[in-house]
């Protein structure tokens, strides 16, 4: 009887895990294909439902935040703060389940960048500084993560030449990101693997 119960419990755990994996794979594909704010909002809500159902998995909270972040970068300025704040709330939940994770720090970097872009001149010292701190933390945790150099390049690309930025400074970082993507292997197929095309596109923009 005990053995039978153990088999049934193991089977139930496997089925739940398999269901989680399938739901995540479906939503990651939807996130990759999303083009509009509405599509990103829908996939963010779907990831959040998975996260709240599972309770112990950080990745659905992370992806819900990423969907909000991508939506935030394209949003009107008057909406950017609220969207970035929602992403930060989700990332706090992810971080409570998975501390010291480079991907979470990179997402926090992007959320702070969205806040900063609302008014770069007045927000650089606060949100710009926070974004830089999160990027440095991600690099310390995972120096071979290609998204580190993509986001570092993005920061320099958007910084005026007179302040140490510009295309010439950004291009080597985008090139390094592309090169690292050639050997980068995520932990599994649910882990973050976005950014190679973005980095390659930015190399072209720097020419």
Question: Where do the language-model regions lie?
Answer:
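Bacterial Sec-dependent N-terminal signal peptides
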Residues: 1-20
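Amphipathic alpha-helical repeat scaffolds of TPR domains
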Residues: 17-30, 53-75, 100-119, 144-159, ...
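Helix-turn-helix repeat elements of alpha-solenoid scaffolds
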Residues: 32-46, 79-90, 124-132, 171-176
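Canonical positions in the second alpha-helix
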Residues: 50, 94, 137-138, 177
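Hydrophobic, well-structured mid-protein blocks that either form specific transmembrane helices
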Residues: 81-133
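Outer-membrane beta-barrel transmembrane domain signature
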Residues: 123-147, 154-165
């Amino acid at each position: 009887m005990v053995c039978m119960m153990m088999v049934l419990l193991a089977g139930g755990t496997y089925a739940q895990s398999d269901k989680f994996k399938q739901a995540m794979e479906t939503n990651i594909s939807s996130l990759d294909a999303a083009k509009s704010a509405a599509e990103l909002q829908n996939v963010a809500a779907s990831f959040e439902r998975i996260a709240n159902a599972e309770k112990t998995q950080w990745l659905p909270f992370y992806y819900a935040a990423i969907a909000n972040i991508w939506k935030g970068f394209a949003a009107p300025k008057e909406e950017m703060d609220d969207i970035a704040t929602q992403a930060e709330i989700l990332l706090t939940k992810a971080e409570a389940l998975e501390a010291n994770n480079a991907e979470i720090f990179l997402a926090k970097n992007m959320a702070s960048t969205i806040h900063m872009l609302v008014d770069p001149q007045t927000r650089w010292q606060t949100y710009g500084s926070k974004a830089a701190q999160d990027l440095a933390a991600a690099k310390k945790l995972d120096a071979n993560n290609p998204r580190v150099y993509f986001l570092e390049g993005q920061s320099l690309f958007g910084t005026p030449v007179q302040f140490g930025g510009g295309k010439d400074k950004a291009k080597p970082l985008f090139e390094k990101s592309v090169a690292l993507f050639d050997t980068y292997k995520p932990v599994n197929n649910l882990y973050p693997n976005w950014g190679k095309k973005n980095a390659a596109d930015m190399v072209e923009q720097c020419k």
